[in-house]
Amino acid sequence: MQQRRPIRRALLSVSDKAGIIEFATALSQRGIELLSTGGTARLLADAGLPVTEVSDYTGFPEMMDGRVKTLHPKVHGGILGRRGQDDGIMAQHDIQPIDIVVVNLYPFAQTVARPDCSLEDAVENIDIGGPTMVRSAAKNHKDVAIVVKSSDYPAIIAELDENDGSLTYPTRFNLAIKAFEHTAAYDSMIANYFGALVPAYHGDTEQPSGRFPRTLNLNYIKKQDMRYGENSHQQAAFYIEEDVKEASVATALQLQGKALSYNNIADTDAALECVKEFSEPACVIVKHANPCGVAIADSLLAAYDKAYKTDPTSAFGGIIAFNRELDAETASAIISRQFVEVIIAPSVSTEALALLAAKQNVRVLTCGQWQERSAGLDFKRVNGGLLVQDRDLGMVTEADLRVVSQRQPTEQELRDALFCWKVAKFVKSNAIVYARDNMTIGIGAGQMSRVYSAKIAGIKAADEGLEVAGSAMASDAFFPFRDGIDAAAAVGITCVIQPGGSIRDDEVIAAADEHGIAMIFTDMRHFRH
């Protein structure tokens, strides 16, 4: 259906005024009558545009501090009236058709994000008339266009010019979908906010009393369909949050290479989030969502060389993340040394990109620089439900550590311990990481017993000819028995960092003392499943 509808009358009422003067000017220049409300009407009038206040159009004033202004039959009749079917009743009541509605809603999300937001503030930023107009126009998209995003303004003007002042049905239908998505997201935010107040339990509704609402409403936007999911028999798509502020795989720009696969995205996320932990030039190589090599150094090339040496076998076909601009020297080393699926960095130099162009199958992403890790929620789907928790942003510094062994760690052991502790946070549990001189020596991931993760880390190091003696070992959770310490001592580990908290901590500490190992407690666990 390509049926066009001429646009002769527009109703504009926006909280976000970005681009509205330019858009309204373009509409007016094309002979379209402008109706508007409150602050939007004043803004347009001040810009010299011919605009009719809705209260003048309806003959009914705004009241109750603006709570009631567009809830009137002349407004909604003009929007909902079916052309060719309701013309008679519209004429009888002097209702003029409204052909395009331009509305965005009160800034509820921004309001409740303020630390000083009260319940009264939140309530006053719940839009009533706006969503009603949006839904009315979207319902009647056969005859009316609804615009909720300023990013659509240029395309609408261009189409009006291409179609003699009309908009096509596909455009109106697409705009209606955006409108329903917009109101659904808006109502979800309100429901989530009120659901977190839980007044029945706390008796204080001035501030949210819980992190998690009674009903969880989520809104994500589809970024791409995927060829398949984790396996080829599974269909899949990638959805992203609407306004992601933090540098992430969701917001990254792909400079070259094939479309990202489901597994590419999952692994790239794991690599990028791990490399964000480090302030020094760092490289993280990931395979199947587990780091297989991590290092920091004075240069990106040195960091990559060290990370690669941890486990060259696993690095084949892996994902590489950096926390600095990718330079030509490092790019050259990568493509001459290994097959890589994805490279992600804050930026890529022109020279590096020219070198990578010789390997067009390599997916190259830039994510921009990051400042701080944003708080958010993690989700895990279970059959029939969803587990929700805060993101694991827990960190420890040297000041947080407790040395529980007889021997104190050396300065180098302490640096290595803090380094491998950061890595262990991103290794699947049970996680054991060996590190020395700011590089991983061996990584044991995902084993059902902690001692076997420790043994695997030692085997990995031995296979690559890496010297374990004098290395630090990190464990993402406490050691339930001394066997993990005995295994570490057997390969030359001299410092262990772990959360502590086992009922057998005394036995584990005693084992460390027997072997002359310095043991550090963090009092923070980092399970990752």
UniProtKB/Swiss-Prot annotation:
Domain MGS-like: 1-148
Record InterPro entries: AICAR_Tfase_dup_dom_sf, Cytidine_deaminase-like, MGS-like_dom, MGS-like_dom_sf, PurH-like
Keyword Mitochondrion: no
One example of a Gene Ontology biological process annotation: 'de novo' IMP biosynthetic process
Any one annotated GO CC term: cytosol
GO MF: IMP cyclohydrolase activity; phosphoribosylaminoimidazolecarboxamide formyltransferase activity
Domain of life (superkingdom): Bacteria
UniProt xrefs under SUPFAM superfamilies: Cytidine deaminase-like, Methylglyoxal synthase-like
Entry-linked NCBIfam families: PRK00881.1, purH
Annotated domain remarks: The IMP cyclohydrolase activity resides in the N-terminal region.
Name of the protein in its database record: Bifunctional purine biosynthesis protein PurH
Native organism: Yersinia enterocolitica serotype O:8 / biotype 1B (strain NCTC 13174 / 8081)
Highest classification ranks of the organism: Bacteria, Pseudomonadati, Pseudomonadota, Gammaproteobacteria, Enterobacterales
Gene name, Swiss-Prot/TrEMBL: purH
